[in-house]
Amino acid sequence: MKVVLTKDVEGWGTIGDVIEVKKGFARNYLIPRGLALELTEENKRFIDNILAQKARKLQREKEKAFELAKKLNGVEIEIERPIGVTGKMYGSVTTSDITEKLKEKELEVDKKKIMLRSPIRNLGSYNIQVKLHPEVSATIKVHVVPESK
């Protein structure tokens, strides 16, 4: 029996694939669980339409990411932190701190997209990568400076 997959099925294929399976497997497993539909012209068009919508949505997300990357590239932010008598910084700079500073510049970025291996614990300048989309990233410069009294 030929079916068209409505979801990714491990070992069988991805959404939109037309596969040949035994009738029992299709009727008792794939179709009741919503993983596949019996192959008809109408069902094939339905799945193709869903795939086209998904592709358009992914393209729009990628375009938005490119626009934001253009704005973010070259942005420099300054974060002040208190330092002790020995010159060591109290606390650290995290992705949340960077996100807040970007918001002040009217740039909305989810903190999960900021690629920071570990919190910044020293004063200095750092180039930080912001991964906006699997294919789009930007680099911002973060200056960690002593807090002015």
UniProtKB/Swiss-Prot annotation:
Q: Which InterPro entries match?
A: Ribosomal_bL9, Ribosomal_bL9/RNase_H1_N, Ribosomal_bL9_bac/chp, Ribosomal_bL9_C, Ribosomal_bL9_C_sf, Ribosomal_bL9_N, Ribosomal_bL9_N_sf
Does the keyword field hold Transcription?
Answer: no
Look up and give the organism this protein is from.
Sulfurihydrogenibium sp. (strain YO3AOP1)
Q: rRNA-binding: is it a keyword of this entry?
A: yes
Its transmembrane ranges are none
Q: Which UniProt keywords apply?
A: Ribonucleoprotein, Ribosomal protein, RNA-binding, rRNA-binding
- Its function? Binds to the 23S rRNA.
Q: Which family does it belong to?
A: Belongs to the bacterial ribosomal protein bL9 family.
The protein's name in its UniProt record? Large ribosomal subunit protein bL9
Any single Gene Ontology cellular-component annotation: ribonucleoprotein complex
Q: List, in alphabetical order, the Gene Ontology terms for molecular function in this entry.
A: rRNA binding; structural constituent of ribosome
**GO biological process: any one?**
translation
SUPFAM superfamilies (UniProt xref): L9 N-domain-like, Ribosomal protein L9 C-domain
A Pfam family for this UniProt protein? Ribosomal_L9_C
Superkingdom field:
Bacteria
